[in-house]
Amino acid sequence: MPDVESFWHSLEEAYQAILSAPSFDAWIKTTRPLKLDNNQLWLEVPSAVHRDYWEKNLSAKIVETGFKLTGAEVMPHFVVADEKDAALAQELEEPAEEEVVFSEQSKKAMLNPKYTFDTFVIGKGNQMAHAAALVVAEDPGSIYNPLFFYGGVGLGKTHLMHAIGHQMLVNQPDAKVKYVSSETFTNEFINSIQTKTSEQFRKEYRNVDLLLVDDIQFLAEKEATLEEFFHTFNDLYNENKQIVLTSDRPPNDIPKLPERLVSRFAWGLSVDITPPDLETRIAILRKKADAERLEIPDDTLSYIAGQIDSNIRELEGALVRVQAFATINGEDITTSLAADALKSLKSVGSKNQLSILQIQEEVSKYYHVPLKDLKGKKRVKTIVVPRQISMYLAREMTDNSLPKIGAEFGGKDHTTVIHAHEKIQQLLEKDPAIQKEVSEIKNLLNS
């Protein structure tokens, strides 16, 4: 049997091979080996969140590595460092009071009670974002500040943002946490000017420990609001207060966002969240079904997950639809019933939800450009403009992410899609011919 330090070193190498750098830093570097005795391994972790994550996601590797090194199963045990403190032990004996305080603080911070780390399903598309969120929640204002999540609609950016707020309030019940959408920030700023309460507005936003701002891209063209947010950002950052932002695209791809803000957003960590793969979609549905106490066979969940691949909101909406269909018809939930329930949804989707390929085909026919050229690399104007219009329409008329759109045009980078979108926007403002052509193509796509 190896000693605990050499066994831990082997484990570190095993995890380093399968985890991203932020995940490795979040889970492995924060863990301390205590004892290895009689095939039992004791590890000290910094929080209950870390313990839960280890138990759910990382324990199997301990058993696997132990078997390789010793020929026997090594069983892990986790000790939370803070639970050694008598003060915390006393708090754990009185959970009801703590829950009330937590609930009141969460409501005051405008946090959604459903959006916690416990309800978040981890997959390949969000693993790094989840790890970074946990790091920030456990140690705000230090490593990743600001933390910037970006990705398409309904992929979990807001969920992670709220989860950070909840966890910080669990760790620091007296912390001042504020969640706000960019629209609300703008409206409150304008109102403070009209009512001459600007100083009160600044105190509210600059005297917080954690500021969560959703959909920051909508501030891009609001000059006065951006100026106010710039100073708010600086004040909080200089005081080592944590800032978390979300957007549908990376900071440097947000049109008309001032360079001074782009550079500040880059001071921390920017993480993209991509659509969930099939396994993650099934796990999301299982978690939702368990929360709703629904009895659904695995093959039925797999069927539903196979029908919806766009985002988590639509996926959960499909499950609600199946549940309602079963209740109305007084039937058990089966794959056959799910197919009937989602039939009309797919029918509506086929009419109203365009694919990138449909847009490409329509543009190809309209301009008499071969589809392979539209997706290819030819740079002649008769092909470049239709290609840019295709990218523009894909951005405007679908929920696909920038990388996804780029991939459908011969593997182009997402910055190419951004450039195409901006180029066509500019042409639409001054070129009547382009206005007419884009309008006609839109009508064809909507007909």
Swiss-Prot record:
Residues 110-326 are annotated as: Domain III, AAA+ region. HAMAP family: DnaA_bact. Plays an essential role in the initiation and regulation of chromosomal replication. ATP-DnaA binds to the origin of replication (oriC) to initiate formation of the DNA replication initiation complex once per cell cycle. Binds the DnaA box (a 9 base pair repeat at the origin) and separates the double-stranded (ds)DNA. Forms a right-handed helical filament on oriC DNA; dsDNA binds to the exterior of the filament while single-stranded (ss)DNA is stabiized in the filament's interior. Strand separation requires the DnaA boxes and adjacent DnaA-trio motifs as well as ATP. The keyword NAD does not apply. Gene3D superfamilies: 1.10.1750.10, 1.10.8.60, 3.30.300.180, P-loop containing nucleotide triphosphate hydrolases (3.40.50.300). Residues 327-447 are annotated as: Domain IV, binds dsDNA. It holds the Pfam family DnaA_N. One of its GO terms (biological process) is DNA replication initiation. Belongs to the DnaA family. NCBIfam families: DnaA. Residues 1-74 are annotated as: Domain I, interacts with DnaA modulators. It comes from Enterococcus faecalis (strain ATCC 700802 / V583). Its main location: cytoplasm. ATP binds at residues 154, 156-158. The keyword Manganese does not apply. Keywords: ATP-binding, Cytoplasm, DNA replication, DNA-binding, Lipid-binding, Nucleotide-binding. PANTHER family: CHROMOSOMAL REPLICATION INITIATOR PROTEIN DNAA. SUPFAM superfamilies: P-loop containing nucleoside triphosphate hydrolases, TrpR-like. Oligomerizes as a right-handed, spiral filament on DNA at oriC. This is Chromosomal replication initiator protein DnaA.
